[in-house]
UniProtKB/Swiss-Prot annotation:
Disruption phenotype: Completely abolishes the 11'-deoxyverticillin A production. The gene is verI. It comes from the Eukaryota. This is Aminotransferase verI. Induction: Expression is regulated by the cluster-specific regulator verZ. Aminotransferase; part of the gene cluster that mediates the biosynthesis of 11'-deoxyverticillin A, one of the dimeric epipolythiodioxopiperazines (ETPs) from the verticillin family that act as mycotoxins. 11'-deoxyverticillin A is required for normal conidiation. The nonribosomal peptide synthetase verP is speculated to be responsible for condensation of amino acids to form the carbon skeleton of verticillin, whereas the cluster-specific tailoring enzymes are involved in further modifications leading to the production of 11'-deoxyverticillin A. SUPFAM superfamilies: PLP-dependent transferases. GO terms for molecular function: pyridoxal phosphate binding; transaminase activity. Pathway: Mycotoxin biosynthesis. The lineage of its organism: Eukaryota, Fungi, Dikarya, Ascomycota, Pezizomycotina. Its cofactor is pyridoxal 5'-phosphate.
Length: 428
């Protein structure tokens, strides 16, 4: 017999995710998955590097428990090198600032446990990744407070901060932090330095935590104001009361995640305790040499960016070809778009999902991300070219589009694509 806690948690999960759960169970292995946010474009090179490291560096000691609290010394040192090289933080990241875990979600679970009590709340811009609710509501009894922001209408830092402040004032629960996803999932955009600094100041004034989820920090390929990563900002805001926390699940290597807190030793220790013995020692041995070799990783990152840019261009061209409303991605592995302007209800949205599934293309619906307006969908483009084009063709069939996109469009002399550009949201 399950505990009361388990029964209540399971009931909540089955109700909250009943639509996506209802789409599972297909016996077909010919479906093309455009719903799951994974990067397949750099996998051959990553797999080769991991195999090489396993063969060259794996020792009998790696079959034992990992030494150290928060991660092995080798892995913590490699992660420190990684952050300092790629993000150039004002305050260098030291091994003692880092805690490793089994993945970004796992680390986020324990982090929310440490900064929130039952019934507390976290501010988060909507739409947002659905599993944020798993880490907050399911695991910790913490409420997510959606902050409705129309980024295509408001580009001012003050306007965005005002939206967070309004959401905080209108909620009945105690707000303990701001959950910041940058690059954003599912929009695929990056907020400006001005906005980030304004949000950090807001958190300091409100005496709440700033939690920065940056899992796509290295997958940036388009126009943006912020170089990559947020660690170079916020030095003047760092304090134990308003700790700047970075959660990064390495977007090239899904073999774990880590948390960084540079000013809160108490939080770092608590996180190290909660995540102790969670990360496989063998995984650490395979990943550490890659993260610690800046030259090797730079090559992989550059190659990944080239492939991501090409794939994103195809996704954008598809949306332009059919005159769809979309958010132009500059980071991440997906595009956020409307497959139909005649989608007005959640049932309409789910009907489109089912149609696409029937034709062998799995897509993510806006309701999965707490999008307030029905009709938005997330399509992952970081898969092999032929699979992505086939997936798009299946969507065309499902939607009844009269014309077929073949992956090519004529470019103007200015480099812009000939399309209905007025329907594009450039979110930078």
């Amino acid at each position: 017999m399950l505990s009361r806690r388990a029964r209540e948690s399971n009931a909540w999960f089955l109700e909250r995710f009943k639509r996506p759960l209802g789409r599972q169970g297909s016996k077909s292995n010919t479906n093309i998955d455009l719903a799951t946010a994974e990067n397949w474009l750099i996998r051959p090179e990553i797999l080769s590097a991991l195999k090489r490291n396993l063969q060259a560096d794996f020792q009998s000691s790696h079959l034992s428990y990992a030494p150290g609290l928060g991660g092995t010394p080798e892995l913590l040192s490699a992660i420190s090198t990684f952050f300092n090289h790629f993000f150039s933080p004002t305050i260098p990241v030291a091994p003692e600032h880092i805690v490793t875990g089994a993945g970004c979600s796992s680390v986020l679970d324990t982090l929310i446990n440490d900064i929130c009590d039952d019934g507390d709340g976290l501010l988060v811009a909507a739409p947002y990744w659905g599993s944020f609710e798993v880490s907050s509501v399911l695991r910790n009894g913490v409420t997510l407070i959606p902050v409705q922001i129309k980024f295509h209408e408001s580009h001012s830092a003050q306007g965005i901060v005002d939206a967070y402040r309004k959401a905080m004032e209108n909620t009945s629960c105690k707000v303990r932090g701001l959950l910041f996803c940058n690059p954003h999932n599912p929009w695929g955009h990056i907020l400006s330095v001005e906005v980030i600094d304004a949000l950090l100041l807001f958190c300091e004034q409100a005496d709440i935590h700033f939690v920065s989820d940056e899992i796509y920090a290295l997958s940036t390929f388009g126009r943006m104001e912020l170089p990559s990563g947020n660690l170079e900002h916020g030095e003047k805001f760092l304090s134990p009361a308003t700790s700047f926390v970075s959660v990064l699940s390495r977007d090239l290597i899904k073999l774990g995640g880590c948390l960084i807190t540079q000013a809160n030793k108490e939080l770092r220790m608590s996180q190290a305790i909660l995540n102790n013995a969670k990360l496989c020692n063998a995984a650490s041995a395979m990943v550490a040499p890659i993260l610690g070799s800046t030259s090797q990783l730079s090559t992989l990152v550059n190659l990944n960016v080239q492939r991501m840019r090409k794939a994103a261009r195809t996704a954008i061209q598809f949306a332009q070809f059919h005159g769809l409303t979309f958010c132009e991605p500059v980071a991440g592995v997906y595009i956020w778009l409307r497959l139909s302007e005649d989608c007005h209800t959640r049932d309409d949205e789910e009907e489109i999902v089912q149609r696409c599934t029937k034709h062998g293309a799995l897509v993510g619906s806006g309701s999965d991300y707490s999008e307030s307006q029905p009709g938005w969908f997330r399509l992952t483009f970081a898969i092999p070219d032929n699979e992505f084009l086939e997936g798009l063709n299946r969507i065309e069939t499902a939607m009844g589009y009269k014309e077929r996109f073949n992956g090519e469009m004529v470019q103007s002399s200015l480099g812009g694509f000939v399309s209905q550009l007025w329907k594009r949201f450039v979110l930078v």
